[in-house]
Structures are given as structure tokens and as C-alpha cells.
Amino acid sequence: MGSDQTWVLFDNMRPRNHALRGILIFFWCIDLVAVASGQTATSRLIPDDNLSYPVLIRIGTTTGSGFYLTTERHVFLVTATHVLYEPDRRTLNGMQAEALSYASDPKERTQAVFRLDLKALSENGNIRIDNLHDVAVVRVAMVTGEGAAMRSRPVPGVVARSAPKSGYVTAGTHTVKRFADVLVSNEVIVFGYPSSLGVTNIPQLDYFRPLLRKGIVAGTNEALKSIVLDCAVYPGNSGGPVVELTRDATGTRFRIIGVIIQYVPFEQGDATKVLSNSGYAVAAGMDAVLDLVATFK
């Protein structure tokens, strides 16, 4: 399927038992809303289609995580800057990348696979980064029209290699919570592809399937608008979304609060210092992502 393929955008029936829902053909647009009290949405904590939320980003031999974010006129791939760029923040980690995610229907095995020409996307102004907060957005498609007439077309440099019939999961900007509204002690779920796990190729781990970690918001840094999580992450998790869970009388509400940017090491040993994973992680607040998205007209 070439890059000139027209993608049709439409809404599904929006059943009340979905916390993350809405559809684009190829894009399953998320509404993160409360599930009514007393209503059983699913046998698990989150709806089945949410397990397909994270995106695996492959650049050469390196990998990272990300997620799709949709506005009225654009579709973006959100990730950490260091997933795409070398430490100088000017040199791309590679000229080509692949973005892989699973179908919104967990029974469908077809992946959504996009080939990204990072060099072309960068030269055309479709990659924008925030060096201070280590977040990046890649515009992958333009949306035109309204209602039933809405269409989504990939930008130059993006080629759809395969697409599941049921679409794939993405989020709308209205599902995002800004830094000022993040609540310390609330539960969070981190989605991503921690590729450094099982370095001896443990057969029980499917490296092309995302893993979830559950933790809490341990603290915040107002100056940097960053969030400290009591939740272990590993190389490969960078760029993945952090979803906060809040509960009230109406049920559970899910909001995207950040992007994983690093784990917090701790030093152990006397004569020989060894850095280990402390179990804490840092996420950039979504304010920086929203600011980048707002620069696209």
C-alpha cells in the first residue's frame, strides 16, 4: 500500500464500556472517559483494545516506544527525542524507521506497519523536538474534511506497509492531562517495549508485543514539568505513554500524563561503583508535547 493511499475516518458506535475508543480506518481514536459505576467494562483493568496502544519504533538495531496522537487536522507519532536523535540532537539515529502497532481488535493478528523516511520528514519540517524536555512529535498524516467526509492522508516520507481491518489505537488531545493537573499518589500504567529485558533471548518474551508496568506518581518537578514515577522502566521503554488512573463515584477515568524519558539509577558498591535501576522513572509532562503539536498549522 503506497503513501498516496487515502484513509477514511469515521466514528464507531461509542459503546459505554470502552474507556479508550473512536475509530479511524487505520486509526482507532481514543476517548478516555469514565466507565459508569457498577458497570463491568471488561474482565481486566483496561479495555482489551488499549493493550494495542503503544507503538514499537525500530531504527536500525535500536528500538524505542511511542504512541499516536490525533488532532483535528493532524496525526502525530509521539516519542522521546533520544529515540530519534543522537545526543547532539542534530543527527538522526538512522535515516529510516519502522513504526509497528497492533490492531484495536486483540483477536486480529495483522500489525499496523509504517515505514518512516526520517530524513525526508525532518527536511520537510514534520519532525519537531523539545530538547529541554526530551520529547519529539512526528507528523505522519494530514486530516481534511469534517464528519463522514473526513479523510486522512500520509505526509511525504510515510508509507503504509500493512494495516489491520479493525484499525489501531490512537489518542485525541482531549484525553491528555496537563502537568498542573497530575496528582501525586495516583496510579499509573506505563506502556512500552522494554527491549533490553531478556538479553539472553528468553523464549517466554515476545519482543514485538508491548509490556505494561503499574506504579504510582511518586513526585513532580514543577520547574521542568517532569513527573517521577515509582515504576521501573528499561531501555526500549523511552517514548512510551504514561496513563494515569483516577477513580470517583462514576468509575475509573484514564488520562495520558506523560512520555517516558529515562529511568533513575542508583549507585551501589564501595570500591567498584555499579549503577543499577532504582525502580523509579522520569516522564516528561504532556505540556511539551501539546506545545509542539500546536506549532503545526
Residue spans of the language-model regions?
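Catalytic nucleophile loop of clan PA
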Residues: 229-260
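Bacterial N-terminal signal peptides
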Residues: 22-34
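N-terminal secretory signal peptides that target proteins for export/translocation
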Residues: 1-20
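C-terminal cap/linker of serine protease catalytic domains
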Residues: 43, 253-297
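Catalytic histidine site
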Residues: 45-111, 117, 141-143, 179, ...
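Boundary at the C-terminal end of the N-terminal hydrophobic targeting segment
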Residues: 36-40
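Terminal peptide-recognition signature
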Residues: 66, 75, 79, 138, ...
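Short glycine/Trp-rich loop-beta-loop segment that forms part of the substrate-binding cleft
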Residues: 160-202
